[in-house]
Amino acid sequence: MTTSRRKAREIVLQALYEQDLAGHNAEDVLKRLLTETPQTEENAEFIFRLTNAIVKHKDLLDENIRQFASAWPVEQLSYIDRNVLRLAIFEIIHENDVPIKVAINEAVELAKSFGGNSSARFINGVLSSVSKALADTAKQREE
């Protein structure tokens, strides 16, 4: 059974994917998707907030992807992998109420559901590197 937040992340991923692939406006895509798959008011707010923030910070998120997946140019990643990483990296860095392990697990599950055969392993590796770098940065701040 999928959790309501997992379903919300699936909708965010669908909107990001469609915007990335077809150039459609993410907010218009969300309105259509939420008509097709109604959500609670709380989830709808989460979906819009998360999607809009990811779209706004796409260039910074892509820089993070470049840093932690340096062997893979962002432009050459599959649309799914690229947008799962954008979503998860945003959550890891900016969503303080989402534990890092949860953000990584949710991203891996999205990759298993929507990505290719090696997507989940790739996503997990990149996000583990992001998590480790954040932990190292936090330790340096404490010292």
Swiss-Prot record:
**Keyword Transcription regulation set for record:** yes
> Might you name a Gene Ontology BP term for this protein?
DNA-templated transcription termination
What InterPro entries does this protein's entry cite? NusB-like_sf, NusB_fam, NusB_RsmB_TIM44
What this protein is called in its record is Transcription antitermination protein NusB
What is the species listed in this Swiss-Prot or TrEMBL entry? Answer: Dehalococcoides mccartyi (strain ATCC BAA-2266 / KCTC 15142 / 195) (Dehalococcoides ethenogenes (strain 195))
Job of this protein: Involved in transcription antitermination. Required for transcription of ribosomal RNA (rRNA) genes. Binds specifically to the boxA antiterminator sequence of the ribosomal RNA (rrn) operons.
- What's this protein's family per the entry? Belongs to the NusB family.
Keyword set, alphabetical order: RNA-binding, Transcription, Transcription antitermination, Transcription regulation
One annotated GO molecular function is: RNA binding
Q: Which domain of life is it from?
A: Bacteria
Q: Which GO terms describe its cellular component?
A: cytosol
